[in-house]
Amino acid sequence: MNSRMIAQAGTDEWYIARRRGVSATTVAKASTPAGFKEALNNALNPVEIPDNGYMRFGRDYEQWIVENIPQTYGIQANDWLVCADGPGNEWQLATPDGLNNDWSVIAEVKTTGKEWPTYHQIPIQYRRQVQWQLHVTGAELCVFAYLLRAETADGRLVPAWYAPELYEIQRDETMIAELIDTAQKLQQEIIYHEEAQRGTL
């Protein structure tokens, strides 16, 4: 097992590790002034996110979406939290939905109620998540796979397509540098406030 694989999703170790670092979801949120405050508050005062039908639909179809990514990418489903390479980078975290064997290609999976016909119509927070995951894993390419959902007359959520739509997303070093800067500032704020709460400043 790769030494940068920290814990599997849903385990106590996974939750503990995420609280000690900055994940793709967190740094994407923290990339605006209001989002930074919210991300900091969430880190210092974590609360459980209420479950809903959209989230359950996403979980139910995540494995299916990964399995429908062409085999040429060599992607396998992943639920391990991984950290960035190099000493002192253990706090830079990501859980890509899929990885190939040498981590040169990752996958990110989404379900949505709205089509994204072009790359730039993908919500910016998702594009930021992808770039952070590319940074943490060191991958050069992300296969972004998304599935449109529809609602039946009786309120059930079902796939609107027979297969997910795919985008190939390359590394954006400018965005990655911005995300690293944001993540470092957030991590510093988290450490400062935690030390203040413990009275160790």
What are these language model-derived features?
Residues 17, 194-195:
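Long, compositionally biased, charged low-complexity segments
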